[in-house]
From Swiss-Prot:
This is Peptide chain release factor 1. It is found in: Cytoplasm. The gene is prfA. Peptide chain release factor 1 directs the termination of translation in response to the peptide chain termination codons UAG and UAA. Transmembrane segments: none annotated. SUPFAM superfamilies: Release factor (SSF75620). InterPro entries: PCRF (IPR005139), Pep_chain_release_fac_I (IPR000352), Pep_chain_release_fac_I_sf (IPR045853), Prokaryotic/Mito_RF (IPR050057), RF-1 (IPR004373). The modification N5-methylglutamine is found at Q234. It comes from the Bacteria. GO terms for molecular function: translation release factor activity, codon specific. GO terms for cellular component: cytoplasm. Belongs to the prokaryotic/mitochondrial release factor family.
Length: 357
């Protein structure tokens, strides 16, 4: 199965090369860019395939030499070389298998993250703020740029909701598995009896979609303007600068009040709407592809409980890959890679099995 998929992928290179010679293709930049991207991807696989075939040839040659070799010392050297080559072969096979996985066209995109307080009242809102701070610190370590789009703050400094953008290399690829329910266990600052409480916040990671990537009919939108308000419902603007956009066919509602001008708030709201509509359409496609099979692992389902943060034990557990670390304090300071890297590997392994690669 592995070799079949490998040969099938590399066999497409020739037909793509022929397409690229078509002069008319360059006139359609969107189509041209898509084909170039596929060609680059297949060339990468082909390079690995050549490397893999070379290793197989070396293994076969060494086995032939070993059968004929009479000197014990040389035999031991050849055996050691075969062990090394087998290890290289195994590592290369894994690299190729990962490349053969269905490609996520959004991996190179910037993202919009939406964090919402779930069960737990004020404590859930404070935890939502903690998660926001964690992602900001992680972004700083990665040299990514961040910008708040909209937020709804509580009186104690928590967030009922915060929406922000992260721009940088491989942002979606790195953070796409963060979507889901994040559960926290700790003693809240609002708890006078010192009892442990369980609260939750929901995270949604959406690829930032350009205007050209999705068609939105103006007739399908209802746009309302109102005065923006701060924590506790206090008015912070005397003009109708806040914007609420309703997409009538889907019922998706987006509102933005963070910017001072109505025009900027509308632009930001449209940015969120594009991302949510894209996610809405994509989830429908995934549902069709799964043929009614439950595919929760790494699906980014917002209702999926993915992680527990236990502060008294300094413990963080990711339930999808059964990974537990006793480094919660470091994790909340933006040291996410110590969990994200093994998580990605485990989810890739699970995907390989489900795709029979």
């Amino acid at each position: 199965m592995f070799l079949e998929k490998l040969n099938s992928a590399t066999s497409r290179i020739k037909s793509i090369e022929e397409k690229l010679q078509d002069i008319n293709l360059i006139k359609n930049q969107k189509k041209y860019s898509k084909i170039i991207k596929e060609y680059t991807y297949l060339e990468k696989i082909n390079t690995k395939k050549i490397e893999y075939e070379n290793i197989l040839n070396q293994i076969n040659d060494n086995k032939t030499i070993l059968e004929k070799e009479e000197q014990q010392e040389m035999k031991e050297l050849i055996k050691q070389e075969l062990i090394d080559l087998d290890k290289k072969k195994e590592n290369l096979e894994h690299e190729i298998k990962i490349l053969l996985l269905p490609q996520d066209e959004n991996d190179s995109k910037n993202i919009i993250i939406e964090i919402r307080a779930g069960t737990g009242g004020e404590e859930a809102a404070l935890f939502a703020n903690n998660l926001y701070s964690m992602y900001i610190k992680y972004s700083e370590k990665k040299k990514w740029k961040t910008e708040i789009i909209n937020f709804n703050e509580t009186e104690l400094g928590g967030f009922k909701e915060i929406i922000f953008e992260i721009k940088g290399k491989d942002v979606f690829k790195k953070l796409k598995y963060e979507s889901g329910v994040h559960r926290v266990q700790r003693i809240p600052i609002t708890e006078s009896n010192g009892r442990l409480q369980t609260s939750a916040a929901t995270v949604a990671v959406l690829p930032n979609i350009e205007e050209t990537e999705i068609d939105i009919n103006e007739k399908d939108l209802r746009i309302d303007v109102y005065r923006s308000s701060g924590a506790g419902g206090q008015h912070v603007n005397t003009t109708d600068s806040a914007v609420r956009i309703t997409h009538l066919p889907t019922g998706i509602v987006v509102q933005c009040q963070n910017e001072r001008s109505q025009h900027k708030n509308k632009d930001q709201a449209m940015k969120i709407l594009r991302a949510r509509l894209y996610e809405f359409e994509d989830s429908k496609k995934q549902e069709q592809r799964s043929n009614n099979r439950k595919q929760q692992v790494g699906s980014g389902d917002r209702s999926e409980r993915i992680r527990t943060y236990n502060f008294p034990q300094n413990r963080i557990t990711d339930h999808r890959a059964n990974i537990t670390l006793y480094k919660l304090e470091e994790f909340m300071q933006g040291e996410l890679d110590q969990l994200l890297d093994p998580l990605t590997i485990e989810l890739q392994e699970q995907t390989l099995k489900s795709n029979n690669i």
